């Protein structure tokens, strides 16, 4: 047979094979999902002391599929835009054949909205191969046919129908999550934000990998640090400081009064993102002949509370530039905390600065005749109670 005849015979065989494939495909049902861009929003509120098992960013997100041409998108993969910069996620930037079955570590930078503090967390990314048509040529929702592997891996798994028939995976699904161990690394409460960007890549016969879609996720973590809600008194190192009422004689010499200021800043475990604070104070006393709302200190040698053995005073706080009375055993609600001016402070046990809300106290002792009081040292406890709205989140 001449070379020409051999070529002609080969051409006929190929044509017949192609026709057989075409007829078989047309006989089977077809399902197609074209890969498209994603712009997801993830908002989660969590308690820093007890974070969830994981925060899901993408949960089995489809990279497209075509049951009639399974290898068209069945070998897709996902890559980062940078291998080193965590601003939008750092991980491999090129697809890899037969990559490790281990998840991909995606380094992503989170920034706290109020303080500007940053932290890089390691997200976990996996992909699985799926089929959308079974061995009986029946369309199905999507069956996983591979273990979870690195997201940058390309190549296709298949389902074994019989010794003579396999079904190639026709698509992939992406899962990205923040594991609980990484959530525990967030140093403070507050609003922590990040933006993840992943490119969906298609494998071509030319061994090129064009970008066919972009998967974006705007992530917002509302982190409440309930273990660190506290009243911060910058001037004192003790949790129960001693405050002098600063009683002074007036010019006439027979009367006394006093004013004492205490720097106080309230930390809500949320970088002052609470909508309101409830503040109350109490001296724990039941005293006769005392004006409503007043507090008292008692003579150390006589705790009866008698008029001549006690000194009465008033308490107020300053919030958002306004002086607010704080009556004994009453609760005052401070509104609009998240819109008020905060103060950056360093608190024990917290590795980065946080924002508290300034609410300085003023203890004012009205004028009284000193001769009407017994001489000696006067003292008592003043208990401040602070409850932010963040405590109920």
Give the role of each language-model region.
Residues 22-25:
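N-terminal signal peptide c-region/cleavage motif recognized by signal peptidases
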Residues 2-12:
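Bacterial N-terminal signal peptides that target proteins for export
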Residues 27-113, 178-318, 360-377, 381, ...:
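N-terminal small/polar-rich segments of proteins
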Residues 297-354:
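Outer membrane beta-barrel transmembrane domains
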Residues 12-20:
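Bacterial N-terminal signal peptides
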Residues 12, 83-84, 94-95, 138, ...:
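General secretory precursor processing signal
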Residues 99-165:
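A surface-exposed loop-and-adjacent beta-strand signature within N-terminal beta-sandwich domains
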Residues 135-139, 143-195, 201-212, 341-377:
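Exposed beta-sheet edge/beta-hairpin loop segments within beta-rich domains
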